[in-house]
Structures are given as structure tokens and as C-alpha cells.
Swiss-Prot record:
It comes from Shewanella amazonensis (strain ATCC BAA-1098 / SB2B). This is Putative pterin-4-alpha-carbinolamine dehydratase. InterPro entries: PCD_sf, Pterin-4-alpha-carb_dehyd, Pterin_deHydtase. GO terms for molecular function: 4-alpha-hydroxytetrahydrobiopterin dehydratase activity. Its EC number is 4.2.1.96. It catalyses: (4aS,6R)-4a-hydroxy-L-erythro-5,6,7,8-tetrahydrobiopterin = (6R)-L-erythro-6,7-dihydrobiopterin + H2O. Belongs to the pterin-4-alpha-carbinolamine dehydratase family. Keywords: Lyase. The keyword Lyase applies.
Length: 112
């Protein structure tokens, strides 16, 4: 289990700090299959997972939904035939928080 995946999310309020540039550089190395995207001025983590068919993609999406409910932190999930695009960001701070990196690592573990 990766160091990030073993952590729990903390409650993220609107005044919580976004990750600094130094933290971003350190944390993104821990989840190398993820990329940073900026949409509408909001920094987000994104990864595309590939599957053999829609049924497997949907099963992964459902597992991710369960994980999100357990951690009370919810991603953008776009499910299509053979592919699931997952996007993590903290809505309350309109950017990236340590929680997003924790959840990205936990999302990767769903493949195991």
C-alpha cells in the first residue's frame, strides 16, 4: 500500500489551504499516472483508466463511488465504453488539497 493510500481524508473547509507548489511537486511524484489539469482556473488531478468493456468500466466506477462515500470526498467520474476518466479536486477550496492526492492513490488501489 502506498503511503498516500494509507492516509485518511480530513474535513476540508472553505478556508483550508490549497497545496503549495512545493507540495504539489512532491505529491504528484507519488501518483505518477495522474496529471494536473486546469479547468476554469481550477487545478485538478485527472487519470484515465482503460478496461476491456463497459461492464468492467462501470464496476470500477461503482467501486469508486463506494470509496468516495466512505471518505466523504467525491470525484468527477466519466464512464464510457472501456474507459473511466476520474478527476479529483476539492470543491470547497476550488483547487487541490492533500485529500485529492490521497484519494487518487486510493483510486489506483481499486485496480488491485
Amino acid at each position: 500500500m502506498s503511503e498516500l493510500a494509507s492516509m485518511k481524508c480530513e474535513a476540508c473547509q472553505a478556508d483550508a489551504p490549497k497545496v503549495t507548489d512545493a507540495e504539489l511537486a512532491e505529491l504528484i511524484r507519488m501518483i505518477p499516472d495522474w496529471s494536473v489539469q486546469v479547468r476554469d482556473g481550477i487545478m485538478q488531478l485527472e487519470r484515465v483508466y482503460k478496461f476491456k468493456n463497459f461492464k468492467l468500466a462501470m464496476a470500477f466506477s461503482n467501486k469508486l463511488a463506494e470509496l468516495a462515500e466512505e471518505e466523504f470526498h467525491h470525484p468527477g467520474i466519466f464512464t464510457e465504453w472501456g474507459k473511466v476518466t476520474v478527476t479529483w479536486w476539492s470543491h470547497s477550496i476550488k483547487g487541490l488539497h492533500r485529500n485529492d492526492f490521497i484519494m487518487a492513490a486510493k483510486t489506483d488501489q481499486l485496480l488491485d
